[in-house]
Amino acid sequence: MKSVEEQLALIQRGADEILVEAELVAKLKRGQPLRIKAGFDPTAPDLHLGHTVLINKLRQFQDLGHQVIFLIGDFTGMIGDPSGKSVTRPPLTREQVLENAETYKSQVFKILDPAKTEVAFNSTWMDQLTPADFIRLASQYTVARMLERDDFSKRYASNQPIAIHEFLYPLVQGYDSVALKADVELGGTDQKFNLLMGRELQRAYGQEAQVILTMPLLEGLDGVKKMSKSLGNYIGIQEAPGVMYSKLVSIPDTLMWRYFELLSFRSLDEIDSFRKDVEAGANPRDIKIKLAEEIVARFHGEEAAASAHKSAGNRLKEGELPEDLPEIELSSPEDMPVASVLNKAGLVKNAAAARDLLGAGSVKVDGQVVDRTFMLALGETRVFQAGKKAFARITLKAE
């Protein structure tokens, strides 16, 4: 096992916050494998790269010799996480949740080592709680404290309904840490309230409080909003190799460093050398190709990654549009100028680059050269080409 200092440096990589870092150091100094928990509610059947930020961190803990618990929230999934929601989420049936859970297990083991992963379902202990147990659990927190949570307070202030079962969600997630005796819990930055609940409940039930580690929410292909299937700015980990490759090489240049930090297993020194290469004049696309090949290989194998790269290169040489064209959805209250479309979709570095390409006659929409007066209308879907290598099928939806 690596030294405490070496472990801490790796654990800190990409992390937004560690609470409390001194407690983590104390736990590491014991020299015993820690129980590392991360929970996922199977509310949809497919995972995307945004989900893998946490799973990658779990793998890092595995490689450091710690015990990883991949918790499938089949019980909490039927409640629906209210984090960041302005309305009550419709609950799923147990059948829907369990069906989605099966696909999760097959997908996560493309990253995690199955031999070193404990897969748990929170219905295992939650279904065993008696009404008296639930009342004891609910007594550990007050309504006033619940309303300190930003999403609840906003809904309360605007007279939007908050269902009682939504108050139960953070309590149940916190109780999961009690049941699993977690030493560390991972979650996105939007989960901080729920993660802190775990610390409080562990103390209330006579356990040592877990350390919480929050990871950033990965931006989607637009480089602005968090990756989400509903926003259309996602890369699914079960997407075809060519589609995944095309999407990754089409991300904005500035976004690739974020993706390297949160998705790549390369060393920080190697990533820093890539950054210096770009600053010295290297083509950013060449660096994005390295990222795309690494991630496609992780989910589909080295051969598929090499084939995706070769196919993309052949199509570009022949001037053909890619068959696996990236699909991007943008939103706006009104029709959008072509320069804004190119910029927001990440087909160019910035608005100035879009204007330069338009002035040079190097922008095509559905195969036809357009100038800066072109507007993408609300509800339309068009194929955009910026220069020789940047392509995307873009849909403009009304906000």
Curated annotation (Swiss-Prot):
Domain of life: Bacteria
Keyword Nucleotide-binding: yes
Taxonomic classification: Bacteria, Pseudomonadati, Pseudomonadota, Gammaproteobacteria, Pseudomonadales
Subcellular location: Cytoplasm
Molecular function in Gene Ontology: ATP binding; RNA binding; tyrosine-tRNA ligase activity
GO biological process: tRNA aminoacylation; tyrosyl-tRNA aminoacylation
EC annotation from Swiss-Prot or TrEMBL: 6.1.1.1
Entry protein name: Tyrosine--tRNA ligase 2
Reactions accelerated catalytically: tRNA(Tyr) + L-tyrosine + ATP = L-tyrosyl-tRNA(Tyr) + AMP + diphosphate + H(+)
Family matches, as PANTHER family: TYROSINE--TRNA LIGASE, TYROSYL-TRNA SYNTHETASE
Binding-site residues for ATP, renumbered to this chain: K229
Keywords, ordered alphabetically: Aminoacyl-tRNA synthetase, ATP-binding, Cytoplasm, Ligase, Nucleotide-binding, Protein biosynthesis, RNA-binding
Annotated ranges, domain S4 RNA-binding: 336-396
Motif ('KMSKS' region) on chain: 226-230
Gene Ontology CC terms, in alphabetical order: cytosol
Motif window: 'HIGH' region: 42-51
Protein family per UniProt: Belongs to the class-I aminoacyl-tRNA synthetase family. TyrS type 2 subfamily.
Chief localisation class: cytoplasm
One Pfam family cited in the UniProt record for this chain: tRNA-synt_1b
Function: Catalyzes the attachment of tyrosine to tRNA(Tyr) in a two-step reaction: tyrosine is first activated by ATP to form Tyr-AMP and then transferred to the acceptor end of tRNA(Tyr).
Organism: Pseudomonas aeruginosa (strain ATCC 15692 / DSM 22644 / CIP 104116 / JCM 14847 / LMG 12228 / 1C / PRS 101 / PAO1)
Self-association state and partner proteins as the record states: Homodimer.
